[in-house]
C-alpha cells in the first residue's frame, strides 16, 4: 500500500526524524497561504503515487506566494507522466508546500525487504538525490548494504559503521545513528515493506533532514492498522484495481490487449512471460487465488472485461485446490451477463478438468480450450493477429 510523501513525513516526524516544515494544499489559494506561512520562498511538490516528479515538472522552487499560487493553478488537475506512472500519468489533486532548505550534502537511505534473505536490509549511499538504480549501475562501490538480523534488530554499532562509511563524523555521525535506529522502529512498528529517504541531507546549518520520503505498507499487515485504509488516496488508484480489491483479487493493470486470469502468482507471472514470448501483450496481472469460488471467478472475469483495452482473454488455471468446473461456471456466468463477444482461450488442467471443458464447449460462447500453456498463449495471440 502506498501513501503520499506528506503522510510519510508525518510518520517520520512522529518518530523523531527531522523533516522540513510543510503544509498540504487542496487548492491554489491554499498553496498561496501556505507559501506565506513559509516566508514566501518555498518548494511546491505535487503529490502522486510515483517517483520521478521533479523531471516531470512536479517539483519547483518559488520565491514569493503569488508565484506559488500560479504554479499551484498549473499543477492541480494536471496529469504527471513519469517512468513509474505509464503513459496515462497520474492526476495531481494535492500539493505539498515546504520551506526551502539550504543543502550542503545529500545522501540516500532506505530500509526495505530483501526477498532473497527474507530479512530487512538497510541501504545507504553518499550519492543522494538521484535514482538509486542509476547509482547501482554507475557506481556500485558507493552503495552500502546491511542485512539486519531479525533477532537482534539494527544495532547502534552497525548504524555507526554505515554513518562513518557515508563520511559523517562527530555529532552528525551520532545524529545519523539515532536517525537510522528510529527508521528501523518505523519499519517494524508500522509494518512497512519500504521506508526510503532520498535525499537525506545535511543542511547548511549542520542538521540532518529528510527532504523526501516514501513509505510502502505491507498489504498483508493492514488488518493490524485500522487507520491505514483512511490514509489511502483512491484517486491515485486504477478503478479496476479498487474493484478487484473488494473481492480480494490481486489485479494490476498493464498496457497490452490480452486480458489474463490465472490462479497463483507464480503461474500468473509465467503466463505473462509466455504471452510475451509469442508476441502478445498482456493487459493485466490477475491472480484469483487458490480457493476461488464461482462468484469470485465471475467477478474477476467481469473486471477483465471492463478494461476497454482488452480485445481477447486468456484463462490459465491449474485445478489443485480449485475445481476446473467451478472456474468454467464462473467464466460462463460473467461472459453471459455482460454479453461478451471477445475471443476467449482457456487452458485448464487438474481437478474436474473434463467437466470444466465440457461446460465451456456447451456454453455457446466464443471459447476455445487448450491443453498446455504454450498452446493457449500461441492461440490467443494468433486470434488477435
Swiss-Prot record:
Binding of Mg(2+), residues: 198, 212
Co-factor(s): Mg(2+)
GO BP annotations, alphabetical order: succinyl-CoA metabolic process; tricarboxylic acid cycle
UniProt GO cellular component terms: cytosol; succinate-CoA ligase complex
Catalyzed chemical reaction(s): succinate + ATP + CoA = succinyl-CoA + ADP + phosphate; GTP + succinate + CoA = succinyl-CoA + GDP + phosphate
Pfam families for this protein: ATP-grasp_2, Ligase_CoA
Keywords from the named record: ATP-binding, Ligase, Magnesium, Metal-binding, Nucleotide-binding, Tricarboxylic acid cycle
Biological source species: Geobacter sulfurreducens (strain ATCC 51573 / DSM 12127 / PCA)
Binding site for substrate: 263, 320-322
ATP-grasp domain location: 9-243
Gene responsible for this protein: sucC
PROSITE patterns, per database record: ATP_GRASP, SUCCINYL_COA_LIG_3
PANTHER family in the cross-refs: SUCCINATE--COA LIGASE [GDP-FORMING] SUBUNIT BETA, MITOCHONDRIAL (PTHR11815:SF10), SUCCINYL-COA SYNTHETASE BETA CHAIN (PTHR11815)
Cofactor note: Binds 1 Mg(2+) ion per subunit.
Pathway in which the depicted protein is active: Carbohydrate metabolism; tricarboxylic acid cycle; succinate from succinyl-CoA (ligase route): step 1/1
This enzyme's EC code(s): 6.2.1.5
Subunit (UniProt): Heterotetramer of two alpha and two beta subunits.
Keyword Oxidoreductase: no
Recorded coiled-coil stretches: none
Highest taxon in the source lineage: Bacteria
Name recorded for this polypeptide: Succinate--CoA ligase [ADP-forming] subunit beta
Assigned protein family: Belongs to the succinate/malate CoA ligase beta subunit family.
Positions of ATP binding: 45, 52-54, 98, 101, 106
Amino acid at each position: 500500500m502506498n501513501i503520499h510523501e506528506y503522510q510519510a513525513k508525518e510518520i517520520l516526524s512522529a518518530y523523531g526524524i527531522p523533516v522540513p516544515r510543510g503544509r498540504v494544499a487542496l487548492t491554489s489559494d491554499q498553496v498561496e497561504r501556505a507559501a506565506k506561512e513559509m516566508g514566501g520562498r518555498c518548494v511546491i511538490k505535487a503529490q502522486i503515487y510515483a517517483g520521478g516528479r521533479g523531471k516531470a515538472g512536479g517539483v519547483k522552487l518559488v520565491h514569493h506566494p503569488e508565484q506559488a499560487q500560479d504554479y499551484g493553478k498549473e499543477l492541480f488537475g494536471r496529469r504527471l507522466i513519469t517512468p513509474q506512472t505509464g503513459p496515462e500519468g497520474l492526476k495531481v489533486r494535492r500539493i505539498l508546500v515546504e520551506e526551502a532548505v539550504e543543502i550542503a550534502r545529500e545522501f540516500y537511505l532506505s530500509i526495505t525487504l530483501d526477498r532473497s534473505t527474507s530479512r530487512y536490509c538497510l541501504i545507504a549511499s553518499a550519492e543522494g538525490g538521484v535514482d538509486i538504480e542509476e547509482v547501482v549501475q554507475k557506481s556500485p562501490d558507493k552503495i552500502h548494504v546491511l542485512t539486519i538480523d531479525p533477532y537482534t534488530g539494527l544495532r547502534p554499532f552497525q548504524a555507526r559503521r554505515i554513518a562513518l562509511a557515508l563520511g559523517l563524523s562527530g555529532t552528525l555521525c551520532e545524529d545519523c545513528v539515532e536517525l537510522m535506529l528510529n527508521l528501523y522502529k518505523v519499519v517494524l512498528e508500522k509494518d512497512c515493506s519500504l521506508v526510503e529517504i532520498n535525499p537525506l541531507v545535511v543542511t547548511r546549518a549542520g542538521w540532518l533532514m529528510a527532504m523526501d520520503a516514501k513509505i510502502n505498507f505491507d498489504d498483508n499487515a493492514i488488518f493490524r492498522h485500522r487507520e491505514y485504509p483512511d490514509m489511502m488516496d483512491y484517486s491515485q488508484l486504477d478503478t479496476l484495481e479498487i474493484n478487484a480489491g473488494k473481492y480480494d483479487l490481486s489485479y494490476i493493470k498493464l498496457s497490452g490487449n490480452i486480458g489474463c486470469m490465472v490462479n497463483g502468482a507464480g503461474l500468473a507471472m509465467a503466463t505473462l512471460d509466455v504471452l510475451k514470448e509469442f508476441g502478445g501483450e498482456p493487459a493485466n496481472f490477475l491472480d484469483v487465488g487458490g480457493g476461488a469460488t464461482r462468484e469470485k471467478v465471475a467477478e474477476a472475469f467481469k473486471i477483465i472485461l471492463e478494461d476497454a483495452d482488452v480485445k481477447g482473454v486468456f484463462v490459465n488455471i491449474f485445478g489443485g485446490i480449485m475445481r476446473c468446473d467451478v472456474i468454467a461456471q464462473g467464466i460462463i456466468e460473467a461472459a453471459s451477463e455482460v454479453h461478451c463477444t471477445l475471443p476467449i482461450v482457456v487452458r485448464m488442467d487438474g481437478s474436474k478438468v473434463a467437466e470444466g471443458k465440457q461446460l465451456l464447449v456447451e456454453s455457446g460462447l466464443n471459447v476455445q480450450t487448450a491443453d498446455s500453456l504454450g498452446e493457449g498463449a500461441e492461440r490467443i495471440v494468433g486470434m488477435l493477429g
